[in-house]
Amino acid sequence: MMEYKKIIAQNKKALFNYFIEERLEAGIVLKGSEVQSLRQGKASIEESHAADTGNEVFLYNCHIAEYEKANRFNHSTRRPRKLLLHKKEINKIIGRTKIKGYTLVALSMYFNKKNKIKIELGIAKGKKLHDKRESIKEKDWKRDQSRLIRQK
């Protein structure tokens, strides 16, 4: 059975720049104008990351465009947004990100089947330059293989 997800924004660069070791789903605290803007699909999580401050986790650098009809009640486009996670998940994140080289990256933002906005986070370790070259070679080889199969 496939789970319903209406994707709002994806961070495709994260899969290229990081080794994703674990994925988590988190809720996100938003204002009304932000929700309306997300319903129109006006969001970018390309440069966003999450970090812990005390016993809370916040999403930084996530761009949600202003909603035109919100007038003076509009939101700041790049404000830090609190993520909603269970205490055990927060403790796991804090423990893993304390290790050198690990970070918390936003992978995708979507509406779940109950129409709630969720964000998929990845506990990730950065790739070195040679790892990136290797993944490019792998991708090219798979593309060439599919071309050869189609030609036969």
UniProtKB/Swiss-Prot annotation:
The keyword Protein transport does not apply. One of its GO terms (biological process) is trans-translation. It is found in: Cytoplasm. GO terms for cellular component: cytosol. It comes from the Bacteria. GO terms for molecular function: RNA binding. The keyword RNA-binding applies. Keywords: Cytoplasm, RNA-binding. SUPFAM superfamilies: Small protein B (SmpB). It holds the Pfam family SmpB. Its main location: cytoplasm. Required for rescue of stalled ribosomes mediated by trans-translation. Binds to transfer-messenger RNA (tmRNA), required for stable association of tmRNA with ribosomes. tmRNA and SmpB together mimic tRNA shape, replacing the anticodon stem-loop with SmpB. tmRNA is encoded by the ssrA gene; the 2 termini fold to resemble tRNA(Ala) and it encodes a 'tag peptide', a short internal open reading frame. During trans-translation Ala-aminoacylated tmRNA acts like a tRNA, entering the A-site of stalled ribosomes, displacing the stalled mRNA. Belongs to the SmpB family. This is SsrA-binding protein. The lineage of its organism: Bacteria, Pseudomonadati, Pseudomonadota, Alphaproteobacteria, Rickettsiales. The gene is smpB.
